[in-house]
A protein has these predicted regions:
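IMPase-like, lithium-sensitive Mg2+-dependent phosphomonoesterase catalytic core
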Residues: 1-134
Length: 134
């Protein structure tokens, strides 16, 4: 391994989301992003889930793929995208959520089931979950 005993930072100063989606998402997520910006966090979005996750894993941050008006259940596939990265995140001290539930607790109902997806530094994901559930 290139990084033995890897640990994801509990907090970060990076948020990763396609901000082109902002007209179509929950206003609470917009509030969260504004909060991140006020605290000095920077936006970093490559457009590759794995590359974006890897950067946040090393430096600390959160990746957001919320549901939109067009994709009411999100776009990330639960079984072969979200679960794999959620497992890795939890092994290094991070967290993954659909905004309500821990990703690894979601019982799949279909092979290609999609889910909203929030993954990264534990404190950032917890804060977003609190905002989404308030």
């Amino acid at each position: 391994l290139s990084h033995p005993d890897m640990k994801m930072p509990e907090d970060g100063n990076i948020f990763t989301m396609n901000e082109g989606l902002t007209p179509m998402i929950n206003p609470n997520i917009l509030s969260y992003l504004e909060s991140c910006k006020r605290q000095g966090a920077s936006a970093r979005y490559i457009g590759s889930l794995v590359a974006d996750f890897h950067r946040n894993l090393l430096k600390g941050g959160i990746y957001l793929y919320p549901p939109t008006n067009k994709a009411k259940n999100g776009k990330i596939r639960l079984i072969y995208e979200a679960n794999a990265l959620a497992f890795i995140a939890e092994q290094v001290g991070g967290m993954a959520s659909d905004g309500k539930n821990r990703i690894l607790d979601i019982q799949p109902e279909s092979l290609h089931q999609r889910t909203p997806f929030y993954i990264g530094s534990i404190n950032m994901v917890k804060k977003l979950d609190e905002i989404l559930n308030s």
